[in-house]
């Protein structure tokens, strides 16, 4: 497999060129804070570049003629470079420290690599620190890896007052000992508001070499696997057969990269499901008939069988028998009615279901079938059935035996009337035992359409019966479309990002304030806002440590709305009343790591617990995460800190695959999850 660097060189002819702001007369230009060389391929922080007039900069090493101040002289043709010579080159990490002389509300940093055609010193892994005194730096506000090319790099992060900024180059992109920077800028927000206690916290930022338009949690490692398309910043004009991926390891903070060619599949805009064996099944998209399989245990991509129908923007869902159902997807592969089909992990084949008609689930989108069969809200349920909760007003039951079938489940309505279509809204099964699904947001049309605050609770019964549907609370605080969400261990649903009016590849009308829905109280609660726009092509996933991974947006090539990063949201249940991280309960032992549906598991913990839940490992793209669902567990205390519980006996509730087991104490603080595989 090719490394990103070689792929960047292959695509150099189509990469965007940095824009140069003309210098004033006099040659070297002004060192003031206006961004000198703004890339068209990444989103800058919201705010303005800080004047560099009075800055003092220091670096750990410098070559004569390439001193520290060359990175703030306003001239893209000069650069700071660490020492090199016959006596040996100092190895990274290398540090570049800025004293701005006054305290600023800092929310980002930009770094322009050297522009002379030489790659020496390009920064790979890096960390960004802030300090008020130049001595106490704390933990990084941003870290990760930048894509290896010459365009401007950004680190966007939550606003903090600071006087000092430090960029640490942990590695060089090509494994060399040097670091070089042509220009560096620091950004300021217009104001700063300290996070309110009790509403969770954002940060740190994880810088990525790609725009993560799709992602999954690797169940055997806990790493976040992400991918974009054949390019790190765009999907259009794909030659096919190539996907750029990245992985972030929460335990080390390291971002790694891989270019996948073995499956000959550009996996942009796919359907994604974790099958009953735990493999991640990625279907269609830019290569509209292809299937790729990711095996977490071997960290390998495997070619899968072609689908019967070419698809893009379809959804898929794992069923009670571990097979995967998919339907729709007219974004690519032709515009026509794309009925259902099923993938069998055992036979590695796709089978058409000609009577599982797509027509009943179409929205009335003004762009027609090209959009109206996109992103279905699908839930594998009992007896091999699949429930379609939206985004169309119409709900349906799909059946997957023989030639398939479909039966109306009525409309998504309440005492407030029939809900409109909610394309690019969200649907989350927060209590699979009771069949509870929360739906919220979206808009009548895919794009150029105002979002809604509508929210509903759908309660499923037996397949084929009409579900009960009621309005949830008073709806969302904020109208949203292109937002994302995850179910949390305590049964609440975290909702973030989105736009008030859906316009793909624009960061207009963003919603920065997330919400949490608490079902016991039937109430939505505002949380602390973030400062990075997350709209079209953003993703969210629940991490095994109970935090939320939220990233991406854009993937539009030569635009200013590409978000090469992610953030971590820490829910309030991980803090104590003093605002410090709470002491977590720990699972010290599980009687098994694999259990059949209906089986019992005994666990030991280091302290008393009161609740437990299973949450299926998630996959996410284009507002869809059909894999996540939560099972609240009934605990039996065996004495001391030993507990047991039974997994539901219906595989339509406890879908086969990998699950996260969380336990919670009386304060509601969750443990780090243990991974449990549920089998049939």
Curated annotation (Swiss-Prot):
Signal peptide start-end: 1-24
Protein name, UniProt field: Galactose oxidase
Domain F5/8 type C: 42-189
Active site: 536
Residues that, per the record, bind Cu cation: 313, 536-537, 622
GO annotations of cellular component type: extracellular region
Gene Ontology MF terms: galactose oxidase activity; metal ion binding
Propeptide: 25-41
Cofactor binding summary note: Binds 1 Cu(2+) ion per subunit.
Reactions this protein catalyses: D-galactose + O2 = D-galacto-hexodialdose + H2O2
Keywords, in A-Z order: Copper, Disulfide bond, Kelch repeat, Metal-binding, Oxidoreductase, Repeat, Secreted, Signal, Thioether bond
Gene from which the chain derives: GAOA
Cross-link (3'-(S-cysteinyl)-tyrosine (Cys-Tyr)): 269-313
Cofactor: Cu(2+)
Known partners and oligomeric status: Monomer.
A Pfam family matched in the record: Kelch_1
Function: Catalyzes the sterospecific oxidation of primary alcohols to the corresponding aldehydes. The biologically relevant substrate of the enzyme is not known as the enzyme exhibits broad substrate specificity from small alcohols through sugars to oligo- and polysaccharides.
UniProt keyword tRNA-binding present: no
Main localization category: secreted
EC number, as in UniProt: 1.1.3.9
Free-text description of this protein's post-translational modifications in UniProt: Galactose oxidase contains a protein-derived free radical cofactor. In the active state, Tyr-313, which is cross-linked to Cys-269 via a thioether bond, is oxidized to a radical and acts with Cu(2+) as a two-electron acceptor in the oxidation reaction. The cross-link is believed to modulate the redox potential of the tyrosyl radical, which is further stabilized by a stacking interaction with Trp-331 in the active site. The post-translational formation of the cross-link is closely linked to the propeptide cleavage event, and both are copper-dependent, autocatalytic processes.
Disulfide cysteine pairs (residue numbers): 59-68, 556-559
């Amino acid at each position: 497999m090719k490394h990103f660097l070689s792929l960047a060189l292959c695509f150099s002819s189509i990469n965007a060129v940095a824009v140069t702001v003309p210098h004033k007369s006099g040659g070297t230009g002004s060192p003031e804070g206006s961004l000198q060389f703004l890339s068209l391929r990444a989103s800058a922080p919201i705010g303005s570049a800080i004047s560099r007039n009075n800055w003092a900069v220091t670096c750990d090493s410098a070559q004569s003629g390439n001193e520290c101040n060359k990175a703030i002289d306003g001239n893209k043709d000069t650069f700071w470079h660490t020492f090199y010579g016959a006596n040996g080159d100092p190895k990274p990490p290398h540090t570049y420290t800025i004293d701005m002389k006054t305290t600023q509300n800092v929310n980002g940093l930009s770094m322009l690599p050297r522009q002379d055609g030489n790659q020496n010193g390009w920064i790979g892994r890096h960390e960004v620190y802030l300090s008020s005194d130049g001595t106490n730096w704390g933990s990084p506000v941003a870290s990760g890896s930048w894509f290896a090319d010459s365009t401007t790099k950004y680190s966007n992060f939550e606003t903090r007052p600071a006087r000092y900024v430090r960029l640490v180059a942990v590695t060089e992109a090509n494994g060399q000992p040097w670091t070089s920077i042509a220009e560096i800028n620091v950004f300021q927000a217009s104001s700063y508001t300290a996070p309110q206690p009790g509403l969770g916290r954002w940060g740190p930022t994880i810088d990525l070499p790609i725009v993560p338009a799709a992602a999954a949690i690797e169940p055997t490692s806990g790493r976040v696997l992400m991918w974009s398309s054949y390019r790190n910043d765009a999907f259009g004009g794909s030659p096919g057969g190539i996907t750029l991926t990245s992985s972030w390891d929460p335990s080390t903070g390291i971002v790694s990269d891989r270019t996948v060619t073995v499956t000959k599949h550009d996996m942009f805009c796919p359907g994604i499901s974790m099958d009953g064996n735990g493999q991640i099944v990625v279907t269609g998209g830019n290569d509209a008939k292809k299937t790729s399989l990711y095996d977490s245990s071997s960290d390998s991509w495997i070619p899968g069988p072609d689908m019967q129908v070419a698809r893009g923007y379809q959804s898929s869902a794992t069923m009670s028998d571990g097979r995967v159902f998919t339907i729709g997807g007219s974004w690519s592969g032709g515009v026509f009615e794309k009925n259902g089909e099923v993938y069998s992990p055992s036979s590695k084949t796709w089978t058409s279901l000609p009577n599982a008609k797509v027509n009943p689930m179409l929205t009335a989108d003004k762009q027609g079938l090209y959009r109206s069969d996109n992103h279905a809200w699908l839930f594998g349920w009992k007896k091999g059935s699949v429930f379609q909760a939206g985004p169309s007003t119409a709900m349906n039951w799909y059946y997957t035996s023989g030639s398939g079938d479909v039966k109306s489940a009525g409309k998504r309505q309440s005492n407030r009337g029939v809900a409109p279509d909610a394309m690019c809204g969200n649907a989350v099964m927060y209590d699979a035992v009771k069949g509870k699904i929360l739906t919220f947001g979206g808009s009548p049309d895919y794009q150029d359409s105002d979002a809604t605050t509508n929210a509903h609770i759908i309660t499923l019964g037996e397949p084929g019966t009409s579900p009960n549907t009621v309005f949830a609370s008073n709806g969302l605080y904020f109208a949203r479309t292109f937002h994302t969400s995850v179910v949390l261990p305590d049964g609440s649903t975290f909702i973030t990002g989105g736009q008030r009016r859906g316009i793909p590849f624009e960061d207009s009308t963003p919603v920065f304030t997330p919400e949490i829905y608490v079902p016991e109280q039937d109430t939505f609660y505002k949380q602390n806002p973030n400062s990075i726009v997350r709209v079209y092509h953003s993703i969210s996933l629940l991490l095994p440590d109970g935090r939320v991974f939220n990233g991406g947006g854009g993937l539009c090539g030569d635009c200013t709305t590409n978000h090469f990063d992610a953030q971590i949201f820490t829910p309030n249940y991980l803090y104590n009343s003093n605002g410090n991280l709470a002491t977590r309960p720990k699972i010290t032992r599980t009687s098994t790591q694999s259990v059949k549906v209906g089986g019992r598991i005994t666990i030991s913990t280091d302290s008393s617990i009161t609740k437990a839940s299973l949450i299926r490992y998630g996959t996410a793209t284009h507002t869809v995460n059909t894999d996540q669902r939560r099972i609240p567990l009934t605990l039996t205390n065996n004495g001391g800190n030993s507990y047991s519980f039974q997994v539901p006996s219906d595989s339509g509730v406890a879908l086969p695959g990998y699950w996260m087991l969380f336990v919670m104490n009386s304060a509601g603080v969750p443990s780090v999850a243990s991974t449990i595989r549920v089998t049939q």
